[in-house]
Design a protein with these regions (language model features):
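Core catalytic lobe of class I
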Residues: 2-169
Length: 169
């Protein structure tokens, strides 16, 4: 078992190679948050840790993983133990650009992965309390790609809840 790098009543942080630290803890978790090296540059610190998604699957039921589209596509076979659910885009204020011939990267993807039945995964509808007050009236719609919908009417309040956007600042 490793010695925690930091610990208080709410959180315990361990520092080290994930592939060694997680198995040594001897526990299973509901959610894992990972931000691995993407393995996209020749920099010495940017080396993909082979096998880590499979180790994570042995100890976690769900996972948020930060990365780039290239990282996920290049390593898609390593995520075979996981089911992909959704992704959000984290828009960064200051982007990074190590290549002059590409767009300056001002975002990263955070993708949600899970194992087992979706009904057994803890998920809460993500909302934010910054809705603009308005009244919406929707007419009944014919069957299209979302199915038939009846008429709807609702009023939102200033500062009330709304679904969170998939692009997060």
């Amino acid at each position: 078992m490793t010695t925690p790098y930091y610990s208080d009543d709410a959180v315990t942080l361990h520092h080290g190679d994930f592939r060694e630290v997680l198995p040594s803890l001897g526990l299973d978790v509901d959610l894992l948050i990972a931000d691995p090296p993407y393995g996209e540059t020749s920099l010495t610190w940017d080396r993909w840790p082979d096998g880590w998604p499979s180790i994570a699957a042995q100890h976690a039921r769900s996972m948020w993983c930060f990365g780039s589209m290239r990282m996920f596509l290049n390593r898609r076979d390593e995520f075979a133990d996981w089911r992909f659910s959704q992704e959000v885009v984290w828009e960064k204020h200051n982007g990074s650009g190590l290549h002059a011939d590409r767009f300056k990267r001002v975002h990263e993807f955070a993708s949600f992965w899970y194992r087992g039945p979706w009904s057994e995964i803890h998920h809460v509808t993500p909302t934010t309390n910054d809705a603009t007050a308005r009244t919406v009236r929707r007419k009944a719609k014919p069957v299209h790609h979302q199915g038939a919908r009846g008429p709807a009417h609702y009023i939102s309040e200033d500062g009330g809840p709304r679904l969170m956007r998939s692009v997060i600042y």
